[in-house]
Amino acid sequence: PAGQEKRYAAEVEVLSARSRAVVREPVETLLVGSSIFRLWSSAATDLRDADLVNHGFGGSRTWELVEYVEELVVDFSPEVVVCYCGSNDVNAGASAAAIARRVEIFMKTVEDALPGVGIVYVAINRAPQKRDRWAIVDEANQRIEKACRKGPNRVFVDVNEGLFDARDSPRTELYLEDGLHFRPAAYREVFGPAVRNAIERVRASSRG
């Protein structure tokens, strides 16, 4: 949006340069998004992909995902892009419609630049810290899931089922004290299996 400060230019430059120095081509799977992915230090293990590229950055919002799509995604020509972003938009007061619109712009930009690419979007998590804004989270996820149905190589994965218990309460043991970010068990038990399955599905659809 107009007037937004570009907070992460330096971090993005360092991240992309570091990856260019070490990645093997072609890149099969690339993660991009906010701190939920940035803090997923065990992603390569949990997703069983030793060559995984993780470009989670800062406390990024969806407009920043669009802003840096070339440097963080397109320049690496991945086969599958896994995205998590939107949590910080909710905290900043963005509407569900605005969040979903920017996610769709991101997906379309990636698809236009990389024909045949697979995209996995991981649902915004219904964190305890956002309890009073779960309605916005739910609406944003519904809109993004609908957007994912528009593309043959897009998969929406809802991790929230695994983050809630049988009483429909958040599994607080999976969260850090801030009620927003995750402990390693959440990535190992919830994100890993769900995202692996989604990657397999999108690869199958990409192969036709």
Sequence positions of predicted segments:
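A short helix->loop->beta-strand "cap" motif at the edges of active sites that frequently abuts
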Residues: 114-118
